[in-house]
Swiss-Prot record:
Its EC number is 3.1.1.96. It is found in: Cytoplasm. A Gly-cisPro motif from one monomer fits into the active site of the other monomer to allow specific chiral rejection of L-amino acids. Pfam families: Tyr_Deacylase. Belongs to the DTD family. This is D-aminoacyl-tRNA deacylase. GO terms for biological process: D-amino acid catabolic process.
Length: 145
């Protein structure tokens, strides 16, 4: 699994609904915006490890973690994190897990975070999303497991 983790001061995800734009996930104030990519050999245990790391990583102000101050997380699936653009002009997605593999693992990350006590908002798996955030720092970290 691969996660791009950004310290934010608020973030939201909007998708196009039947009646226009619909906000499907939002966090207010200090927290983390997490883009999660899944590859073929990822497992529920890797999802659990990632959740524990996200809950405890000290990326917030004063070297605090989300668990220290009950800061929220916005978790968004993003298969393009496993894109490969080394050859040619068009990325390939061979390393990205298909949706039927990836979706339950992203859901597992969210479920594990919530089980740890986290407040978690999410995007909508497979949807075209507009993500808005106020990057704080900026402070961005890549986590792989």
């Amino acid at each position: 699994m691969r996660a791009v983790v950004q310290r934010v001061d608020g973030a939201s995800v909007v998708v196009e609904g039947e009646n226009g734009p619909e906000t499907v996930g939002e966090i207010n104030g200090e927290g983390l915006c997490v883009l999660v990519g899944v590859t073929h050999d990822d497992t529920e245990e890797k999802a659990a490890q990632l959740a524990r790391k996200l809950w405890s990583v000290r990326m917030l102000a004063d070297e605090k973690s989300c668990s220290d101050i009950d800061a929220p997380l916005l978790v968004i699936s993003q298969f393009t994190l496993y894109g490969d653009a080394r050859k040619g002009r068009r990325p390939t997605w061979n390393a990205a897990a298909p949706g039927d593999v990836a979706e339950p693992l992203v859901d597992e990350v969210v479920a594990r975070l919530r089980a740890l006590g986290a407040t978690v908002a999410t995007g909508r798996f497979g949807a075209q999303m507009r993500v808005s955030l106020t990057n704080d720092g900026p402070f961005t970290v890549l986590i792989e497991n």
